[in-house]
């Protein structure tokens, strides 16, 4: 069986934070869902939520025993990107490094293609 390239990277830092949050919720069925919606100052914005289920066509990326889930519509905007977790002066948050974004807003939560 040939290896299939995963179109989205789920970093160790993000996976470890998800693992911690799932442990706090005491629900091992939870997965981090990343999605794109219209809005924000640049046209599209990233969203993050926890979800117990997956839907037909969802991409599932696993790291350290936890799962990142992306729906097919959102995935087309995220191919080649990285979902990471950062802690700094601006606070702690999940972030998306998206090579498809032509512009991003200052807070990094919205982008345009």
Curated annotation (Swiss-Prot):
Task: Please provide the Gene Ontology terms (biological process) for this protein.
Answer: iron-sulfur cluster assembly
The record's free-text note on cofactor binding: Binds 1 iron-sulfur cluster per subunit.
InterPro entries according to UniProt: FeS_biogenesis, FeS_cluster_insertion, FeS_cluster_insertion_CS, FeS_cluster_insertion_RrpA, HesB-like_dom_sf
Q: Which GO terms describe its molecular function?
A: 2 iron, 2 sulfur cluster binding; 4 iron, 4 sulfur cluster binding; iron ion binding
- Carries keyword Cell wall biogenesis/degradation? no
PROSITE patterns for the chain: HESB (PS01152)
In this chain, iron-sulfur cluster is annotated as bound at: 41, 105, 107
Pfam families in alphabetical order = Fe-S_biosyn (PF01521)
Q: Which UniProt keywords apply?
A: Iron, Iron-sulfur, Metal-binding
Write down any Gene Ontology CC term. cytosol
Which cofactor does the UniProt annotation name? Answer: iron-sulfur cluster
Family statement:
Belongs to the HesB/IscA family.
Q: How does it assemble?
A: Homodimer.
Described purpose of this protein according to its UniProt entry = Required for insertion of 4Fe-4S clusters for at least IspG.
Which HAMAP family is this protein grouped with?
A: Fe_S_insert_ErpA (MF_01380)
Xref: PANTHER family: IRON-SULFUR CLUSTER ASSEMBLY 2 HOMOLOG, MITOCHONDRIAL
Q: What is this protein called?
A: Iron-sulfur cluster insertion protein ErpA
Which organism was this protein described from?
Answer: Histophilus somni (strain 2336)
Gene giving rise to this polypeptide = erpA
């Amino acid at each position: 069986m040939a290896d299939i390239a995963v179109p989205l990277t789920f970093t160790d830092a993000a996976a470890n934070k998800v693992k911690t949050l799932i442990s706090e919720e005491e629900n091992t069925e939870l997965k981090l869902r990343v999605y794109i919606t219209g809005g924000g100052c640049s046209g599209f914005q990233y969203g993050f939520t926890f979800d117990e289920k997956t839907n037909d066509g969802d991409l599932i990326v696993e790291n350290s025993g936890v799962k990142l889930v992306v729906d097919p519509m959102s995935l087309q905007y995220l191919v080649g990107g990285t979902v990471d977790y950062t802690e700094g002066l601006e606070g702690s948050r999940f972030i998306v490094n998206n090579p498809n974004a032509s512009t991003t807003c200052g807070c990094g939560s919205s982008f345009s293609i």
